[in-house]
From Swiss-Prot:
It comes from Homo sapiens (Human). The lineage of its organism: Eukaryota, Metazoa, Chordata, Craniata, Vertebrata. Residues 177-475 are cytoplasmic. GO terms for cellular component: cytosol; external side of plasma membrane; Golgi apparatus; plasma membrane. Pfam families: PRY, SPRY, V-set. The modification Phosphoserine is found at S418. SMART domains: IG, IGv, PRY, SPRY. Disulfide bonds join C50-C126. Residues 30-155 are extracellular. One of its GO terms (molecular function) is signaling receptor binding. This is Erythroid membrane-associated protein. Glycans are attached at N132. It comes from the Eukaryota. One of its GO terms (biological process) is T cell receptor signaling pathway.
């Protein structure tokens, strides 16, 4: 028995080296070749063949598959000991996912890893123990994504179309968003523009309202000033008469030298230097060299007339151009409701209400000649000039205008107060430039105006003293 036991021990001692001798030879024959590298698909099964091979029929005492390197934690992926798999000390991520496959005839040991993950990629050590001897070697696992060829055509189409579709949807959404933003921006700009226009309109409307209000106020003040100026001008009323020695030969004067009209033919009158021989005009008898003077001329329904003031030195012979530069400050009604101030150039205008009686005011020191519409108590026009030398009233009844302008010009002997017509009386004899008599119907004349003293005394006590020393204003 002892001999048999010793013989068995000796045989065992000889077989173990032989087993590992084959293992060593196998390893040396495959060291560094491509068999140590294994590739597995993601989600598939990896089969890691241990480079160490055993003699056929040999049952290893222990087989360990370890991850290398994994410091400070268990490295065991799979453990086979004493003929069965062991679960202790295994890495948690590999539990239930490994299978050890032994081929006794080939003497090979293979580790299968199920449901391969990306983190399974790396080095693995295969350790085999037979008896008291153990050997180990290393293999490397590479994890690859599934190839397109392994996918179904529908999956491939979906994989291609889906990203493109998502991209198109994103592009469409981006374009829609940009269009919406552009519309919102345009709408905002339009709203802003409308707001600005409304704001500007409101501002302009406010400015226009203020301007109109200011103009109305100014017009009211001007009307009040003109009315006040006309009323104060009337305080300087003078009774003007006509000078027959200056009358054109075709003019016919009344007996009281206050009415003049155009005759049909020239009258036999002396040709003196003071007489107009071309311009059908006549001057007043008064000479003004200082102070304020006001007179009124009734024009009635005449269609043409010229009234005003001229210098004593104006030319009486031949054609004369009436202008302030030549010593004329005249106002003319040319036709209908058209009026002209004979400035240089002429100033044309229309009046809201044609005057039936015209008031003329002269302030010599102030250099002012103003015309007033006595009918509605409004101002018509004002000349300004630095006067020198005597000034005289000027009258021109103008041509007959087809029979529409035959009425005379009548100088009011008193202030005109109403719209009564002043017409020549049929009785009596008339005379040319003093020879033909024209009398005025006294019943048609306006009533006699009260004296200036009576006007002042009728005013309130606080205004009387001030008006007694009042002079006409400068315009």
């Amino acid at each position: 028995m002892e001999m048999a036991s010793s013989a068995g021990s000796w045989l065992s001692g000889c077989l173990i080296p032989l087993v590992f001798l084959r293992l060593s030879v196998h390893v040396s024959g495959h060291a560094g070749d491509a068999g140590k590298f294994h590739v597995a698909l993601l989600g598939g099964t990896a089969e890691l063949l241990c480079p160490l091979s055993l003699w056929p029929g040999t049952v290893p005492k222990e087989v360990r598959w370890l991850r290398s390197p994994f410091p400070q934690r268990s490295q065991a992926v799979h453990i086979f000991r004493d003929g069965k798999d062991q679960d202790e000390d295994l890495m948690p991520e590999y539990k239930g996912r490994t299978v050890l496959v032994r081929d006794a005839q080939e003497g090979s040991v293979t580790l299968q890893i199920l449901d391969v993950r990306l983190e399974d990629q790396g080095s693995y050590r295969c350790l085999i123990q037979v008896g008291n001897l153990s050997k180990e070697d290393t293999v490397i696992l590479q994890v690859a994504a599934p190839s397109v060829g392994s996918l179904s055509p529908s999956a491939v189409a979906l994989a291609v179309i889906l990203p493109v579709l998502v991209l198109l949807i994103m592009v469409c959404l981006c374009l829609i968003w940009k269009q919406r933003r552009a519309k919102e921006k345009l709408l905002y700009e339009h709203v802003t523009e409308v707001d600005n226009l409304l704001s500007d309109h409101a501002k302009e409307k406010g400015k226009l309202h203020k301007a109109v209000k200011k103009l109305r106020s100014e017009l009211k003040l001007k009307r009040a000033a003109a009315n006040s100026g006309w009323r104060r001008a009337r305080l300087h009323f003078v009774a003007v008469t006509l000078d027959p020695d200056t009358a054109h030969p075709k003019l016919i004067l009344s007996e009281d030298q206050r009415c003049v009209r155009l005759g049909d033919r020239r009258q036999p009158v002396p040709d003196n230097p003071q007489r107009f021989d071309f311009v059908v005009s006549i001057l007043g008898s008064e000479y003004f060299t200082t102070g304020c003077h006001y007179w009124e001329v009734y024009v009635g329904d005449k269609t043409k007339w010229i009234l005003g003031v001229c210098s004593e030195s104006v030319s009486r012979k031949g054609k004369v151009t009436a202008s302030p530069a030549n010593g004329h400050w005249l106002l003319r009604q040319s036709r209908g409701n058209e009026y002209e101030a004979l400035t240089s150039p002429q100033t044309s205008f229309r009046l809201k209400e044609p005057p039936r009686c015209v008031g003329i005011f002269l302030d010599y020191e102030a250099g002012v000649i103003s015309f007033y519409n006595v009918t509605n108590k409004s101002h018509i026009f004002t000349f300004t000039h630095n006067f020198s030398g005597p000034l005289r009233p000027f009258f021109e009844p103008c041509l007959h205008d087809g029979g529409k302008n035959t009425a005379p010009l009548v100088i009011c002997s008193e202030l005109h107060k109403s719209e009564e017509s002043i017409v020549p009386r049929p009785e009596g004899k008339g005379h040319a430039n003093g020879d033909v008599s024209l009398k005025v119907n006294s019943s048609l004349l306006p009533p006699k105006a009260p004296e200036l003293k009576d006007i002042i005394l009728s005013l309130p006590p606080d205004l009387g003293p001030a008006l007694q020393e009042l002079k006409a204003p400068s315009f």
